[in-house]
């Protein structure tokens, strides 16, 4: 399943942040922190041709990274969620974007591709390389 991340999410983030700035008493510091993390996640997803949210100790994350290592990807960003200061909130925001809080999560050209199982299936069907080529990641 591929989900196109649209500007609607960015618009929602901007509206939320603008509302916070206009009426700060209605929002908590936690709300602002969530918004900041959401903005950082979206910046990484949209700022790189290939983005992976991973955990260093997760076997599925390791497998997905091994799949990607077979390709000479020219713009790959790997974010090790377990090394982030607010891992729990980051996973919560990833769930808002993709419907999943688990890792790994692979994005190509701003599109959510899936986790290890989906990536393996796409590669087995011969569709991963064309996705990477369309994204100009190879």
Where do the protein language model's features map onto the residues?
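N-terminal leader/targeting and pre-domain segments
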Residues: 2-49, 138
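Alpha-helical interaction elements in eukaryotic regulators
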Residues: 37, 57-60, 64, 86-90, ...
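Local sequence-structure signature of Cys/Sec-based thiol-disulfide redox active-site neighborhoods
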Residues: 37-79
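Short hydrophobic/charged patches on amphipathic alpha-helices used for structural packing
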Residues: 41-42, 91-95
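Domain-wide signal for the mature, well-folded portions of proteins, strongly enriched
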Residues: 58-61, 91, 104, 111, ...
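Short beta->alpha junction loops
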Residues: 80-85
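Thiol/disulfide oxidoreductase modules built on the thioredoxin-like
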Residues: 94-102
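Non-catalytic, surface beta->alpha helical segment in thiol-disulfide oxidoreductase systems
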Residues: 108-138
């Amino acid at each position: 399943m591929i989900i196109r991340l649209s500007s609607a999410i960015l618009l929602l983030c901007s509206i939320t942040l603008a509302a916070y700035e206009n009426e700060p008493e209605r929002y908590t510091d936690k709300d602002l922190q969530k918004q900041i993390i959401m903005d950082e996640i979206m910046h990484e997803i949209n700022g790189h041709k290939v983005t992976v949210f991973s955990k260093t100790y997760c076997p599925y994350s390791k497998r997905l990274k091994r799949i990607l290592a077979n390709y000479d990807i020219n713009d790959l960003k790997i974010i090790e969620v377990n090394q982030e200061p607010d891992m729990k909130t980051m996973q919560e925001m990833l769930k808002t974007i993709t419907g999943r809080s688990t890792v790994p999560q692979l994005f190509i050209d701003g599109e959510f591709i899936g986790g290890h199982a989906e990536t393996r299936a796409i590669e087995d069907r011969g569709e991963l390389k064309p996705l990477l080529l369309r994204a100009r990641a190879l």
